[in-house]
């Protein structure tokens, strides 16, 4: 029962048999097109976003299992705002403004994969990601928003 795990990042709903998937899965003896179809079916909700996927191949039986992870926080922020990409100059140009309600929604989606113990801490991690994407939070810079969270200004969202 030899198991091999292949971890890749694919665009939701658009995996192909080409690199990086094909060369990684091909030598393991499973039908690549079946793997691609399953990945595309499981990631269709994340269309256009980068999604971490784990393909677990049972090499002796030539069977496989596909586990789909949650997209990076930056991709979820861009999806919530309908942005193609973040700011090219994050500290100088603002790409958008996100509400605390959407920050909390993203934090709830990502909380299991984060190191944060509380929803408030998870939200602060997501706000930190807003720095690199170039997105303001409730009209404030991400650093100001984190201070406001610490000060209790947004506590109503965490109850």
UniProtKB/Swiss-Prot annotation:
What InterPro entries does UniProt report for this protein, alphabetically?
Answer: Ribosomal_uL11, Ribosomal_uL11_C, Ribosomal_uL11_C_sf, Ribosomal_uL11_CS, Ribosomal_uL11_N, Ribosomal_uL11_N_sf
What PROSITE patterns does this protein map onto?
RIBOSOMAL_L11
Q: Does the keyword rRNA-binding apply?
A: yes
Keywords tagged on the record: Ribonucleoprotein, Ribosomal protein, RNA-binding, rRNA-binding
Q: Name one GO biological process term.
A: translation
One of the Pfam families matching this protein, by short name = Ribosomal_L11_N
The answer on whether this UniProt entry bears the keyword Ribonucleoprotein reads yes
Relate the protein's function as given in its record.
Forms part of the ribosomal stalk which helps the ribosome interact with GTP-bound translation factors.
Instruction: Report the sequence similarity comment from the record.
Output: Belongs to the universal ribosomal protein uL11 family.
Q: State the protein's name.
A: Large ribosomal subunit protein uL11
- Native organism is Methanococcus vannielii (strain ATCC 35089 / DSM 1224 / JCM 13029 / OCM 148 / SB)
> What does the organism's lineage look like at the top?
Archaea, Methanobacteriati, Methanobacteriota, Methanomada group, Methanococci
